[in-house]
């Protein structure tokens, strides 16, 4: 099976995996912990194994790190985890000043599969909810908690100012 290991964290809301990428100390584990507090399940922390499965990419924990999450100031904690979930969203961590208000839909590719990609300021109070909404929207589902369905497609926007489609 084709795969690669990436420096990231991953959580899942149901069957939707969210890969959280960023530099060391950027807040990946902290955001994953807040996602778990909001109902997500840990997949992996610090390193994530990505595998191609048909037309999807699945995320898995390395065996030595399975069920472990680093909590800064506390240490390594053991949590329930999933061993494999399809990725629905990739989140790149950035500062609040660098995040566009109404960004064009972004895409990333792993193992030849395109996956929706967004930028998030990890320490904003709303970051966990933003990720959950974006993950459900990326796979065309309404969020089960709020019923909200975010508009990821430029044609779904109400401002009428967006041009073009995502690039292949």
Listing of model-derived features with the role each one plays in the protein:
Residues 1-11:
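Pre-Walker A adenine-sensing motif
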Residues 11, 15-36:
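Glycine-rich phosphate-binding P-loop
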Residues 8-10, 47, 105:
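Short, acidic/polar N-cap/turn motifs at the starts of alpha helices
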Residues 87-168:
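Conserved NTP phosphate-binding and transfer environment spanning the P-loop NTPase/kinase superfamily
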Residues 5, 83-85, 112:
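A short, structural micro-pattern
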């Amino acid at each position: 099976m084709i795969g690669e290991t990436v420096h990231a964290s991953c959580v899942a809301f149901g069957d939707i995996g969210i890969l959280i990428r960023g530099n060391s100390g950027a807040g990946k584990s902290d955001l994953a912990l807040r996602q778990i507090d909001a109902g997500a399940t840990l997949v992996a922390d610090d390193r994530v194994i990505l595998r191609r499965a048909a037309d999807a990419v699945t995320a898995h924990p390395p065996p030595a790190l399975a069920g472990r999450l680093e909590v800064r100031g506390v240490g390594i904690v053991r949590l329930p985890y999933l061993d494999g979930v399809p990725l629905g969203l990739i989140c790149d961590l950035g500062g609040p000043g660098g995040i566009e208000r109404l960004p064009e839909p972004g895409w990333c590719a792993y193992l030849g599969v395109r996956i929706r990609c967004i930028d998030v300021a990890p320490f904003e109070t709303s970051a966990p909810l933003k990720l959950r909404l974006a993950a459900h929207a990326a796979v065309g589902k309404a969020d089960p908690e709020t019923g909200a369905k975010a508009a990821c497609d430029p044609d779904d926007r109400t401002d009428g100012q967006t041009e073009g489609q995502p690039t292949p």
